[in-house]
């Protein structure tokens, strides 16, 4: 398949995300229509990407699963946004992001993997913390979702690391277990779910990036310092810019 055709399909996929969500979420989300429509859309994207990767002989399951995870997390994040204007802006921002990730499906660039991991992880954590606040399901459900989601996400991000699969799975499950324990611990704090998600994201980001460089044998003291400072600055900026409060 030519790259030009793939770019056109990528644009269609990005636009369809906006159209489907907007169609069934105006003026308010109609879950019984929106969720099934999105799942059909997600299945279609997954099938197309599988076909594209196989056709170009670059099929890899963990490379393939990244975009569906991003779309699913991004879709969940839409429900957490409180106002209609913010949702509209969110959908507009989604267009170039989805097009970018879809057009580069199968790309092995390290920076692409970093960006995709960070956006997916942030959206996923905010979604899980938000849903645990608004939908009072048994706590074990959210713990299982957190463990599985983080483990699979980390495992997909480590696919290009030149080590055995067992090493990658060990790293992924270790971070998944840590994220699950952290999710359970911070849930007792009387803070807004966005604050809890930001706090968890920053800790998970630092551990993941250090683990990533450690597996590549490129971890240095300067890198550790840099990412610690970066995570701290990011936390300060997000805490200042995010409307969070102590919950009664």
Describe the residue ranges of each PLM region.
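N-terminal topogenic module of multi-pass integral membrane proteins
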Residues: 1-105, 217-248
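Cytoplasm-facing juxtamembrane segments at the starts of transmembrane helices
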Residues: 2-10, 56-65, 105-125, 141-145, ...
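Membrane-helix boundary elements
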Residues: 14-22, 62-73, 124-135, 145-164, ...
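Short, aromatic-rich membrane-interface segments at the entry and exit
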Residues: 27-37, 83-91, 136-144, 167, ...
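Juxtamembrane membrane-interface segments at transmembrane alpha-helix termini
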Residues: 46-54, 100-109, 129-131, 152-164, ...
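Hydrophobic alpha-helical transmembrane segments in multi-pass integral membrane proteins
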Residues: 75-81, 125-137, 180-195, 235-248
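Hydrophobic alpha-helical membrane segments
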Residues: 176-179, 196-211
């Amino acid at each position: 398949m030519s790259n030009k055709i793939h770019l056109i399909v990528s644009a269609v996929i990005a636009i369809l995300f906006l159209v489907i969500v907007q169609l069934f979420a105006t003026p308010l989300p109609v879950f019984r229509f929106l969720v099934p429509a999105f799942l059909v859309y997600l299945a279609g994207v997954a099938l197309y990407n599988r076909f594209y990767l196989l056709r170009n002989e670059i099929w890899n399951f963990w490379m393939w699963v990244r975009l569906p995870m991003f779309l699913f997390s991004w879709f969940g994040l839409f429900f957490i946004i409180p106002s209609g204007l913010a949702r509209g802006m969110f959908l507009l921002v989604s267009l170039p992001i989805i097009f970018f990730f879809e057009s580069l499906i199968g790309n092995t660039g390290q920076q692409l993997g970093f960006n995709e991991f960070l956006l997916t992880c942030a959206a996923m954590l905010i979604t899980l913390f938000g849903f645990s606040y608004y939908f009072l399901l048994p706590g074990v459900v959210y713990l299982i979702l957190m463990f599985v989601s983080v483990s699979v996400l980390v495992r997909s991000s480590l696919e290009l690391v030149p080590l055995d699969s067992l090493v990658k799975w060990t790293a992924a499950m270790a971070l998944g277990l840590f994220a699950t324990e952290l999710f359970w611990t911070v849930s007792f704090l009387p803070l807004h779910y966005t604050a809890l998600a930001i706090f968890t994201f920053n800790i998970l980001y630092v551990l993941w990036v250090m683990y990533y460089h450690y597996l590549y044998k490129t971890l240095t003291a300067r890198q550790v310092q840099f990412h610690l400072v970066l995570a701290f600055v990011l936390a300060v900026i997000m805490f200042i810019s995010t409307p969070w409060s102590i919950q009664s």
